[in-house]
C-alpha cells in the first residue's frame, strides 16, 4: 500500500486538500477529536502518516513512506537523501536574517565578527555566514527565537518569515533573505525509480493539477 508522510502544522490543511483533489482522502487528520497518527484512505489503496515536519524526510528517506510533503527549508537544513519531485506552490515563506529595529545594522555584513546568531536552522545559518566569510557563533534555539536579540543573547536571528508580523510585534526587522521556501513533494528514490505501489500515478496527477490553469 502506498504510504504518504504528511506534516503536522501549517502545511497540513493544504496537503490534505491536494491529495483529496486526486482522490485520496486523509481529512480525518483535521478532525479535532482525531488521535490517530495513521489513516487509510477510503479507497483502501493508500495510507497517510501524520508526523512532525522535520520527520517527514526521515520517513521518506528510510522507505517507511514513499511520498511526503515538506517545506523546502527543512530540505535545505537536513539535506536528506530523497527525490525532490515538485514545488507545490503553497506554504510560501522565506528564511531571513533579522535584528532589533533599534540596532545599527543595515545588512548582514554590518554584524561584528563573532556575533551570536540564534536559529533552529543551524546548518543553513552557518553556511550563509561562512559564504560571506563572516565568522559568527550560531546558537541553536528551537522556540521563540525572537527572544534572542530581545534578551541580548544574540545580535541576530535566522528564522522563517511569512508575513513579517511576528518580527514587527517583537521589534525586529529583516536584514536579508537567505532563500524562499514552499512546500515540496518528495519521494523515496528507489520506490520512485521502480514505481512501487503505482507511485507514478499520484505524482502525475498532482503534476497535472499544478499545470492546470487556475479558474
Curated annotation (Swiss-Prot):
Instruction: Name the catalysed reactions.
Output: 1-(5-phospho-beta-D-ribosyl)-ATP + diphosphate = 5-phospho-alpha-D-ribose 1-diphosphate + ATP
Q: Which locations, inside or outside the cell, does it occupy?
A: Cytoplasm
One Pfam family it belongs to: HisG
GO molecular function terms noted in the UniProt entry = ATP binding; ATP phosphoribosyltransferase activity
In terms of PROSITE patterns, this protein maps to:
ATP_P_PHORIBOSYLTR
Pathway(s) annotated for this protein in UniProt: Amino-acid biosynthesis; L-histidine biosynthesis; L-histidine from 5-phospho-alpha-D-ribose 1-diphosphate: step 1/9
GO cellular component annotations of the record: cytoplasm
Among the record's GO biological process terms, what is one?
Answer: L-histidine biosynthetic process
EC assignment: 2.4.2.17
- Predominant subcellular localization, coarse grouping: cytoplasm
Return the Gene3D superfamilies for the record.
Periplasmic binding protein-like II
Q: Which UniProt keywords apply?
A: Amino-acid biosynthesis, ATP-binding, Cytoplasm, Glycosyltransferase, Histidine biosynthesis, Nucleotide-binding, Transferase
PANTHER family according to UniProt:
ATP PHOSPHORIBOSYLTRANSFERASE (PTHR21403:SF8), ATP PHOSPHORIBOSYLTRANSFERASE ATP-PRTASE (PTHR21403)
Q: Record's family? A: Belongs to the ATP phosphoribosyltransferase family. Short subfamily.
Task: Please describe the quaternary structure of this protein.
Answer: Heteromultimer composed of HisG and HisZ subunits.
The record's function comment reads: Catalyzes the condensation of ATP and 5-phosphoribose 1-diphosphate to form N'-(5'-phosphoribosyl)-ATP (PR-ATP). Has a crucial role in the pathway because the rate of histidine biosynthesis seems to be controlled primarily by regulation of HisG enzymatic activity.
Q: What is known of its domains?
A: Lacks the C-terminal regulatory region which is replaced by HisZ.
Protein name as it appears in the record: ATP phosphoribosyltransferase
Which organism is this entry from?
Cyanothece sp. (strain PCC 7425 / ATCC 29141)
Amino acid at each position: 500500500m502506498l504510504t504518504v508522510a504528511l506534516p503536522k502544522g501549517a502545511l497540513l490543511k493544504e496537503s490534505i486538500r491536494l491529495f483529496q483533489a486526486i482522490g485520496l482522502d486523509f481529512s480525518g487528520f483535521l478532525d479535532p477529536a482525531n488521535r490517530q497518527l495513521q489513516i487509510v484512505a477510503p479507497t483502501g489503496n493508500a495510507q497517510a502518516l501524520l508526523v512532525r515536519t522535520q520527520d517527514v524526510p526521515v520517513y521518506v528517506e528510510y522507505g517507511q513512506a514513499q511520498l511526503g510533503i515538506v517545506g523546502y527549508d527543512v530540505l535545505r537544513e537536513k539535506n536528506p537523501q530523497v527525490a525532490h519531485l515538485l514545488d507545490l506552490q503553497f506554504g510560501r515563506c522565506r528564511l531571513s536574517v533579522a535584528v532589533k529595529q533599534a540596532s545599527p545594522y543595515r545588512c548582514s555584513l554590518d554584524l561584528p565578527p563573532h556575533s551570536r546568531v540564534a536559529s533552529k536552522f543551524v546548518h543553513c545559518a552557518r553556511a550563509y555566514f561562512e559564504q560571506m566569510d563572516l565568522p559568527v557563533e550560531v546558537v541553536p534555539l528551537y522556540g521563540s527565537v525572537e527572544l534572542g536579540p530581545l534578551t541580548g543573547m544574540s545580535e541576530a536571528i535566522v528564522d522563517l518569515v511569512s508575513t513579517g508580523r511576528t518580527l514587527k510585534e517583537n521589534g525586529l526587522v529583516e536584514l536579508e533573505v537567505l532563500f524562499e521556501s514552499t512546500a515540496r513533494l518528495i519521494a523515496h528514490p528507489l520506490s520512485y525509480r521502480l514505481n512501487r505501489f503505482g507511485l507514478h500515478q499520484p505524482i502525475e496527477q498532482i503534476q497535472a493539477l499544478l499545470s492546470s490553469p487556475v479558474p
